[in-house]
Amino acid sequence: MDEITIKALQKFVTKFRDDRDWRRFHHPKDLSMSIAIEAAELMELFQWHKQSMGDRKEMEKEFKKYIQDQQLIQRIQEELADVLIYCLFLTDVLNIDLNEAIKMKIKMNEKKYPIQEVKKRDKKRE
């Protein structure tokens, strides 16, 4: 599958779901819980890994270790896909246009985090 829009991706995953008659199990509460569970599985892949604070060269070395570990990358991909699939199921059930939701949220973040106030800053704003 080549590049795909969010809408097309949503149709792709909902067809998979609907072909198996699973929509009847997709209550928003359960889908939101599934998103959290899958996100926790993603977090678990990074648990106990060293994290360099501030030293850019050390951070770059750590990133290279992640990228070179193909088994870890495969597991990360699977968990990211699970999170996104459940997000797409939830947007379908609640009839949310994810394209519009993302655009709206980015506009809100642009106001909250103006470039001139946050770019090249090392510390989080108060």
Which functions belong to the PLM regions below?
Residues 1-80, 84-126:
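Flexible "arm" and connector segments at domain edges
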